[in-house]
């Protein structure tokens, strides 16, 4: 299948190839790339042919719809997929822990933390790193050293994206990676994972500010045409379409495991910040996977929950620090892709260009007025697919304790605070629905050892709890390694660009 990509803010007919969309990351107009067509699969394909496939085979079947064979031939795509998941600690890649609290509730936990950095983002970023390497090897084949293409990857992280990006790109030829994170606002283990990597192509910057400050810097860099031209800036944040694509697979995979390969009633509960993870679930639903509802679980930074309730997308004045810091955001970057879809369906009569104009107006209004609202019928259309729950700090810790006390498969199961936000939301859905025919799949987005402070606060009063039992040896050893960090007490984008350029000069990659 041939597939092209367009910008969420474009009113033109211009499109990009998969390679262009992945390497560029963010469109020239500030929009996000998305596929022009979402394939729709027949029920027969899903439940007779796909239901019992391995994770890797499912990924292959899904990605073939979004990556044209002329861009990546099928044998080479399969090799990329196999290599991307070879470092995961589970043969299933994303195993589903079924009926965690007993058979009556049908509460299943999808463990997404079995990759090299113990976070769900490994599922996407191991694949993205190999994609970058594949495209660069092909582009640089048979060219002189002076003519080689070099990518400069720039990303912002609230914790797990940074380490997953670094582990996906470390040591890759012709790639330099610069990760910005808010100083003092990520967990010690997350910082250690990013800053103890010795590969020379990896650079970390601790910024005095919030995650949104870091993200705004990155977005400003991406729309700077001159800086892009000089340094071939590329993205690994959740704005990169390849990340969404890689995450679609585990919605199919876990659905089939929960229902034993049969059609069934399934709700997915997804801890949500930048909306990339749950957006992948929406694409799975649009492809034909019969998901009953996608439940957005937010913490106290609740722009998504407020939108679902009121139809107003409004940026708060400041970020609230919570026990689930990866979700401490003001603006949910990937939500723009969902808005484009519903603008096209509900307001633009299926016209891609008109949908782009509408989304562009909304985000201009957000930039100028910090808010915009949408028509009620568009909001109703979104509510048909989505529900939302807001979970505060108190209930986050209470959910960690609840699972620890009530888990049966296994007993004394420990979850991280982001997963706990999802579990709290799932339990509310279970209590509301009172229907044991529904399967509730709650996404476990990180290993609990990555968030020691919150887990210890929740569980330290239990006599049989010891954090040392939770901490994997690989993470324990990070504390003994030397850190490489550049501290930046300025959120001026020009300062950050100067630092990046200086490092590229020092590495002999850029000669001004």
UniProtKB/Swiss-Prot annotation:
InterPro entries: Ser/Thr_deHydtase_PyrdxlP-BS, Thr_synth_N, Thr_synth_N_sf, Thr_synthase-like, Threonine_Synthase, TrpB-like_PALP, TrpB-like_PALP_sf. The modification N6-(pyridoxal phosphate)lysine is found at residue 121. Pyridoxal 5'-phosphate binds at residues 273-275, 277, 445. Gene3D superfamilies: 3.40.50.1100, Threonine synthase, N-terminal domain. The keyword Amino-acid biosynthesis applies. Its cofactor is pyridoxal 5'-phosphate. Pfam families: PALP, THR4_C, Thr_synth_N. Pathway: Amino-acid biosynthesis; L-threonine biosynthesis; L-threonine from L-aspartate: step 5/5. One of its GO terms (molecular function) is pyridoxal phosphate binding. It catalyses: O-phospho-L-homoserine + H2O = L-threonine + phosphate. Its EC number is 4.2.3.1. Keywords: Amino-acid biosynthesis, Lyase, Pyridoxal phosphate, Threonine biosynthesis. PROSITE patterns: DEHYDRATASE_SER_THR. GO terms for biological process: threonine biosynthetic process. It comes from the Eukaryota. NCBIfam families: thrC. Belongs to the threonine synthase family. Catalyzes the gamma-elimination of phosphate from L-phosphohomoserine and the beta-addition of water to produce L-threonine. PANTHER family: THREONINE SYNTHASE FAMILY MEMBER, THREONINE SYNTHASE-LIKE 2. This is Threonine synthase. It comes from Eremothecium gossypii (strain ATCC 10895 / CBS 109.51 / FGSC 9923 / NRRL Y-1056) (Yeast).
């Amino acid at each position: 299948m041939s597939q092209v990509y367009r910008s969420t803010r474009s009113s033109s007919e211009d499109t990009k190839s998969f390679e262009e969309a992945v390497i560029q990351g963010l469109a020239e107009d500030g929009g996000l790339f998305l596929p022009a067509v979402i394939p729709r699969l027949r029920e027969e394909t899903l439940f007779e042919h796909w239901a019992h496939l391995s994770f890797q085979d499912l990924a292959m079947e899904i990605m073939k719809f979004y990556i044209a064979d002329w861009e990546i031939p099928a044998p080479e795509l399969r090799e990329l997929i196999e290599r991307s998941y070879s470092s995961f600690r589970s043969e299933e890649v994303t195993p589903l822990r079924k009926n965690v609290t007993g058979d009556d509730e049908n509460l299943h936990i999808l463990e997404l933390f079995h990759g090299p950095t113990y976070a769900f983002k490994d599922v996407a970023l191991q694949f993205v790193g190999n994609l970058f390497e594949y495209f660069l090897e092909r582009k640089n084949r048979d060219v002189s050293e002076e003519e080689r293409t070099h990518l400069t990857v720039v990303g912002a992280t609230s914790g797990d994206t940074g380490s997953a990006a670094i582990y996906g790109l470390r040591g890759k030829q012709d790639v330099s990676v610069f990760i910005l994170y808010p100083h003092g606002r990520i967990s010690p283990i997350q910082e250690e994972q990013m800053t103890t990597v010795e590969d020379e192509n990896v650079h970390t910057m601790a910024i005095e500010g919030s995650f949104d400050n870091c993200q705004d810097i990155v977005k400003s860099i991406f729309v700077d045409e001159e800086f892009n031209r000089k340094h071939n800036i590329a993205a690994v944040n959740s704005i990169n379409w390849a990340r969404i694509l890689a995450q679609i697979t585990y919605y199919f995979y876990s659905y089939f495991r929960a229902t034993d390969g049969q059609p069934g009633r399934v709700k997915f509960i997804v801890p949500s910040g930048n909306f990339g993870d749950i957006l992948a679930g929406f694409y799975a639903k649009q492809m034909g996977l019969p998901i009953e509802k996608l439940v957005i679980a937010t913490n106290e930074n609740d722009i998504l929950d407020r939108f679902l309730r009121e139809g107003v997308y409004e940026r708060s004045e400041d970020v609230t620090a919570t026990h689930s810091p990866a979700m401490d955001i003001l603006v949910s970057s990937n939500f723009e892709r969902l808005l484009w879809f519903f603008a096209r369906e509900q307001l633009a009569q299926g016209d891609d260009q008109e949908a782009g104009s509408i989304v562009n107006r909304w985000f201009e209004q957000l930039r100028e007025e910090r808010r915009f609202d949408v028509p009620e019928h568009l909001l109703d259309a979104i509510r048909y697919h989505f529900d939302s729950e807001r979970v505060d700090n108190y209930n986050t810790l209470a959910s960690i304790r609840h699972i620890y006390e009530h888990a049966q498969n296994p007993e004394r199961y420990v979850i991280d605070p982001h997963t706990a936000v999802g579990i709290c939301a799932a339990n509310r859905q279970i209590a509301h629905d009172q229907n044991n025919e529904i399967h509730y799949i709650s996404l476990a987005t990180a290993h609990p050892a990555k968030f020691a402070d919150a887990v210890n606060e929740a569980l330290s009063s239990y006599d049989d709890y010891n954090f040392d039992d939770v901490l994997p040896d690989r993470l324990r050893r990070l504390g003994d390694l030397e850190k490489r960090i550049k501290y930046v007490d300025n959120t001026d984008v020009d300062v950050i660009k100067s630092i990046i350029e200086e490092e590229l000069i020092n590495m002999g990659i850029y000669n001004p």
